[in-house]
């Protein structure tokens, strides 16, 4: 091996190292793939669906109601919908969502049992905390059972369902 071969080898190696570093940075800080597990998001997302999670978006803007998010709770990664925002009082009565006493449309659920924020120990949602529910309200472990979710436990926004291929959808 002469000096030119060594230089060429080092150039190629550097290209691969840079490519791997970029891929790792994107995977750690920008996007990830997540499989939906369980029926809690039926019919929006079903068990086995693969989604793309945008990890960067909530560093750039606030979380909004009705966004689908990936979160970590009790060492489990799950997908839920944001229903309640910081400073709000949430109540479900007769299958209708009320935010601060005002009726809000919620067409994603066919059946939601009556629920008040007070039943999980709050009058209003504290700063940097959120109330999340599964779209399949009758079969979901969500804020009604495990409490509010800290902003720091929200991994990112579910942007796209990429599998199954015949049901690709942008959210």
Where are these regions (language model features)?
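Protein maturation boundaries and topogenic segments
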Residues: 1-77, 149-153, 157-171
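Soluble extracytoplasmic domains of inner/organellar membrane proteins
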Residues: 118-171
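Mid-length scaffold segments of soluble, non-membrane domains
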Residues: 77-81, 85-97
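Structural motif
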Residues: 49, 64-68, 88, 129, ...
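Short strand-turn-strand beta-turns centered on an Asx-Gly dipeptide
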Residues: 99-101
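Short, surface-exposed secondary-structure edge patches
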Residues: 40-44, 59-62, 81, 87, ...
């Amino acid at each position: 091996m002469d000096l030119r071969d060594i230089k060429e080898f080092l150039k190629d190696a550097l290209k691969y190292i840079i490519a791997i570093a970029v891929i790792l940075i994107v995977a750690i800080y920008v996007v990830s793939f997540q499989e939906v597990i369980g029926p809690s998001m039926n019919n929006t997302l079903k068990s086995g669906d693969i989604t793309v999670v945008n990890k960067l978006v909530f560093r750039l803007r606030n979380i909004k109601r009705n966004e689908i998010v990936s979160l970590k709770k009790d060492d489990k990664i799950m997908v839920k919908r944001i229903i309640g925002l910081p400073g709000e009082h949430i109540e479900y009565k007769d299958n209708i969502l009320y935010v601060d006493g005002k009726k809000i449309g919620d067409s994603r659920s066919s059946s939601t049992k009556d629920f008040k924020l007070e039943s999980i120990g709050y009058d209003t949602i504290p700063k940097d905390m959120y109330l999340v529910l599964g779209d399949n309200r009758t079969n979901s472990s969500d804020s009604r059972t495990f409490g509010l979710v800290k902003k720091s436990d929200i991994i990112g926004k579910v942007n796209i369902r990429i599998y199954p291929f015949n049901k690709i959808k942008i959210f």
